[in-house]
């Protein structure tokens, strides 16, 4: 029995705390599941939401509404999980005690919650470093700094994705 691997079921029928359908993060003072944000972000060339497991041409960043190449979407997905575990460090510590991570709904998607959770459990700092090197993150850092500079100048600027302040619709409730 000592050699049995500990397996964490990362899906909605397993430990829901490790399911993108249940794990929640706050963006612009609103709470969304990681899955809702991720699926909302993926777009076809005409700007419509691509749909789960469907091909997509680019993604819309939920933080600022900017468009990014589809190749960068994994950094957004990892970033959302990093946000979640920053709010729930005890869960990442718990997950790091497992040997294997399973998502029974994995499919052919380029991003899998079990894979990301396993990566973060093994070496969170490495994943954070990789995300910070992405064009998506660097753009977000510049955008955030710009907002901060405007606030220091006394300019009140609030971006609210739910008011549709970009050409794209808001994340639906």
Task: Describe the role of every protein-language-model region.
Residues 1-40:
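N-terminal accessory segments that precede or flank the first globular/catalytic domain
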Residues 9-13, 67-71, 102-110:
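Short, charged/polar micro-motifs that form catalytic or ligand-binding hotspots
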Residues 10, 22, 61-64, 112:
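Generic recognition of cysteine residues
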Residues 16-20, 29, 101, 166, ...:
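Intrinsic structural disorder
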Residues 45-102, 120-122, 126-159:
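Long, contiguous internal "core" modules enriched in hydrophobic/ aromatic residues
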Residues 106-120:
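Active-site nucleophilic cysteine motif
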